[in-house]
């Protein structure tokens, strides 16, 4: 067990060392300061702006920004949907795959354009190289960049600046952050043994003399943006448990760190852009501590194993069901907490096989959305909790709620409440409908408490733009594809609209002079209260489904 926690500590140390560096770099990019990439990136950006007709307008209003984000995402989603439906007539199709069903193609396009990558299919048998590496890979960059752009706009608004130009932020997110890191990361994955080829499946002869076809493809460049952009959709059906996506411990370490580095770095970016690095670090350590607690719960649960099996064996054995031997229980538990905390959604083991503590932790991550949170939007969610904490503490002590020198009033609280309420609506309502008709709709493989967790996880993953699954569901059906699409859209775009209008409203407010009665938000006490508010609000909202799922399952095993 000690060796396992040493492995965890090493990965966390690398994260703590790299996230601030990237955070400072991202702050320089979006503050318009010079960076070492200027000579390479500026000509490319000028070409993109000139070719697309985008002008470097100083800033957009909230309505313009929202319209630009929604319309561009709609166009990209429709474009990719059409590619998927006509993939049989397009190039790079060595296995002769035909088009999927319309509802699966629709769900896939919505899933990738929302940065979720929830997969009701197995990539190597459903989509061509062109569909995966071209169409879906394209959305992996643009959906991640959309999230970063929204986060930066939100940070600008909170700090009293104009929210900016969506198209400019989108392009900068790709050319200055996602592309450079992906290029280096893909080379490292190639060195680690991840394939990158347009050749068809390899024909091999097994030890028994039979002929077998082994799927391969342009995996390395797909894999790195999958993790970096917190996309999570695997080139192969078993995702990062597949040896061609995640062949060894070096690749696993790289992919684990890379999925967390942008959301963790954005917290530092906020502190710099707000002119208050101390507050950025306090928030960073708050999230880090919550993250560490959840890792400990999941890891200990996997180490203790299944009580029923341990009773038969007469000794305690770790839970190795659904895990790759090369990673073991500890790295699988760490990955599970990281991928659900960051809304990446990639998996290196079967979440359906996690013990109840692991199921509790992964569901809690999806419900809270702030450890470390989704690509950009998770950072914004974190500051929504800060705004609500300021409001609540202001009410308790009789002070006018203020955040970063601007009053928190009715409009801000209404928008913040909408952002937080749409999440349970997009999860609990479809979950209730599905469980009301389990035989006709659900396709649940595990009845009872675990079956409830499976259904809730599917919709929580969709609404949180995560994409991982407990699996065990027959989810490539009309019901699952359409109902999950509802959760995908509601969980992505309603919060984005509300976040932008909240930020724009804050930017337009006149700053309030600091007085002796001003509540300081850059203190350890306030940060602790914020952590408490996050846990309490999450517990009040989702405690019933957690009790009916993993908690009840844990008691059932005793």
Swiss-Prot record:
Biological process per Gene Ontology, one example term: potassium ion transmembrane transport
Family: Belongs to the KdpA family.
Disulfide bonds: none
Cellular compartments per GO CC: plasma membrane
Location in or out of the cell: Cell inner membrane
Classification via HAMAP family: KdpA
Name of the gene this protein is made from: kdpA
Example GO molecular function: potassium ion binding
Domain of life of the native organism: Bacteria
Keyword Transport: yes
UniProt keyword annotation of Ion transport present: yes
InterPro entries on file: KdpA (IPR004623)
Assembly mode: The system is composed of three essential subunits: KdpA, KdpB and KdpC.
Main location: membrane
Keywords, ordered alphabetically: Cell inner membrane, Cell membrane, Ion transport, Membrane, Potassium, Potassium transport, Transmembrane, Transmembrane helix, Transport
Name of this chain's protein: Potassium-transporting ATPase potassium-binding subunit
Topology with respect to the bilayer: Multi-pass membrane protein
Cited function: Part of the high-affinity ATP-driven potassium transport (or Kdp) system, which catalyzes the hydrolysis of ATP coupled with the electrogenic transport of potassium into the cytoplasm. This subunit binds the periplasmic potassium ions and delivers the ions to the membrane domain of KdpB through an intramembrane tunnel.
């Amino acid at each position: 067990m000690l060796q396992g926690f040493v492995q965890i500590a090493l990965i966390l140390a690398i994260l703590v060392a790299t996230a601030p560096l990237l955070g400072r770099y991202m702050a320089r990019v979006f503050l318009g300061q010079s960076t070492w990439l200027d000579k390479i990136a500026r000509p490319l950006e000028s070409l993109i702006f000139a070719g697309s007709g985008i002008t470097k307008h100083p800033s957009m209003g909230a309505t313009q920004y929202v319209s630009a984000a929604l319309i561009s995402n709609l166009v990209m989603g429709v474009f990719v949907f059409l590619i998927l439906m006509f993939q049989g007539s397009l190039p790079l199709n060595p296995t002769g795959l035909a088009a999927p069903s319309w509802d699966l193609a629709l769900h896939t396009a919505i899933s990738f354009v929302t940065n979720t990558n929830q997969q009701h299919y197995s990539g190597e048998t459903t989509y061509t190289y062109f569909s995966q590496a071209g169409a879906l890979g394209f959305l992996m960059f643009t959906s991640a960049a959309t999230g970063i752009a929204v986060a930066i706009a939100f940070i600008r608004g909170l700090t009293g600046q104009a929210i900016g130009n969506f198209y400019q932020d989108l392009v900068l997110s790709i050319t200055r952050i996602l592309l450079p890191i992906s290029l280096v990361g893909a080379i490292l994955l190639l060195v680690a043994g991840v394939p990158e080829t347009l050749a068809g499946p390899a024909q091999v002869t097994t030890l028994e003399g039979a002929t077998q076809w082994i799927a391969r493809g342009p995996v390395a460049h797909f894999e790195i943006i999958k993790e970096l952009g917190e996309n999570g959709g695997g080139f192969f059906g078993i995702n990062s448990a597949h040896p061609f996506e995640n062949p060894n411990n070096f690749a696993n370490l790289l992919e684990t760190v890379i999925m967390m580095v942008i959301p963790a770095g954005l917290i530092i970016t906020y502190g710099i852009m707000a002119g208050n690095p101390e507050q950025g670090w306090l928030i960073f350590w708050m999230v880090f501590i919550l993250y560490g607690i959840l890792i400990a719960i999941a890891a200990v649960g996997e180490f203790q194993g299944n009580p029923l099996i341990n009773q038969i064996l007469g000794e305690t054995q770790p839970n190795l069901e659904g895990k790759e031997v090369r990673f073991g229980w500890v790295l699988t538990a760490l990955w599970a907490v990281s991928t659900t905390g960051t809304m990446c959604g990639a998996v290196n083991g079967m979440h359906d096989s996690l013990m109840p503590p692991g199921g509790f932790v992964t569901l809690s991550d999806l419900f809270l959305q702030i450890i470390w949170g989704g690509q950009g939007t998770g950072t914004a969610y974190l500051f929504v909790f800060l705004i609500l904490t300021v409001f609540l503490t202001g009410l308790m002590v009789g002070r006018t709620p203020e955040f970063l020198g601007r009053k928190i009033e009715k409009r801000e609280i209404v928008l913040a409440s909408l952002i937080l309420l749409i999440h349970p609506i997009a999860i609990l309502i479809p979950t209730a409908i599905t469980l009301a008709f389990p035989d006709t709709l659900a396709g649940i493989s595990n009845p009872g408490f675990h079956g409830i967790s499976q259904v809730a996880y599917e919709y929580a993953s969709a609404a949180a733009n995560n994409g991982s699954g407990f699996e065990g569901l027959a989810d490539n059906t009309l019901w699952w594809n359409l109902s999950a699409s509802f959760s995908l859209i509601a969980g992505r775009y309603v919060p984005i609209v509300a976040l932008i209008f909240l930020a724009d409203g804050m930017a337009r407010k006149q700053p309030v002079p600091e007085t002796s009665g001003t509540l300081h938000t850059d203190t350890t006490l306030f940060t602790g209260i914020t952590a408490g508010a996050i846990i309490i609000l999450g517990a009040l909202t989702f405690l019933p489904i957690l009790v009916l799922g993993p908690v009840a399952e844990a008691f059932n095993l005793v």
